[in-house]
Amino acid sequence: MSNASAASNGVDGSTTKVSRFDPTFTDKVIKTTGPKANPRLAQVMPSLLRHLHDFCRENEITVDEYMAAVNMMNEAGRMSDEKRNEGQLVTDILGLESLVDEITYKLADEAGDAPTATAILGPFWRQDAPRRKMGDSIVSGIKDGDHTLMHGRVLDFDTGKPIENAELDIWHTAPNGLYEQQDPEQPDWNLRGRFTTGPDGEYNFYCLRPTSYPIPYDGPAGKLLTLLDRHPMRPAHIHFIVSAPGYKPIVTQVFDRRDKHIEDDSVFAVKDSLVVDFEPKHGDPKAQFDLQYDFKLASFEAAKQRGMKGATEVAP
C-alpha cells in the first residue's frame, strides 16, 4: 500500500485508508483543553475523543443517527429519578458497568485465594436502608415466595479471621420481579436492610429466594434491546455491599445456580464464584431454603502491599 493511500487512524497507529474527512479536526478539539483542566480528565479525554471521533468517521454516522442517540440519552435522563437510573441501565445492557467493575476491582494478587468477587451495583440501590438486628427478616407484606435463611461470615481474606462491625447492605426483588421502589403495592424498604456483624463475624437474616426478572424495558434500554434482538432477563440474584472499617468494601451479587438465565444475564454480571446453591431447609418454620455464603474482604493495608488500585481508604 502506498503512502498516498494509507494513514494512521489516531487510535492505535494502525494503517487504514485515508479518510475523506478533515484529518486535523480531532486534534483541534483535543488541543482546546486548558492548562487548569482536571488532571484525570486531561489524561483520559484525548483517548475518548479519538475513539469517539474515529467511530463516527469509520461508520459514517449521519446527523439523524447522531440525534437518535442524543434523544435516547435525553429520554434516559427524563426517566431517571431517585427511584430509577435509566442512564445506568443503558450502560448495563452494553456491558459497560460490568467491564468497569472488572477493571476497578481486579486485584493484583498471585495467591490461590482472593477476596469475594465483585459485581455491578445496578440502578436500584437505595441509600440508608433500615438497620436490622441479626436474625430479622427483610420481607414485609409478602406471602408468596420461598422464604430463605441466609447466613455466613465476613472474613479477612489474608488471615481468615472474622471481621467485627462489618456492614452488609442487602436488597433484592419481590416474587413479581420488582424492587420495592418500582412497585407501589410493596411497603417502603421491603426486601432491603443493613446488618452489622459481631465479634464472630457472623451474619444471618431471612429473605426470599430470588426469581429471575426482566430489566425495565419501557424506556431507552428496552428499546435498544429490541433493536438488538436481545432479551431483557436477569438471573435470580441478591445484591450486597459489604464494608468494614479498615477494609476495602465490595459491591457484589450472588446468583441462583438453578436459574435458567444463569448463562445469559442481560447485563453480563454473573461470575462463577458468585453462583450459589439454595438448599432445602428443615426444622425452621420461617424458611423453606437455606443459603450459606462467606464474604472475604481485603484490608487496605494488604491492598497497598499488593499495589491494588483503590487501596486508599476514603470517607463515605
Task: Locate each region found by the language model.
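Beta-strand-dominated extracellular/periplasmic modules and repeats
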Residues: 6, 10-316
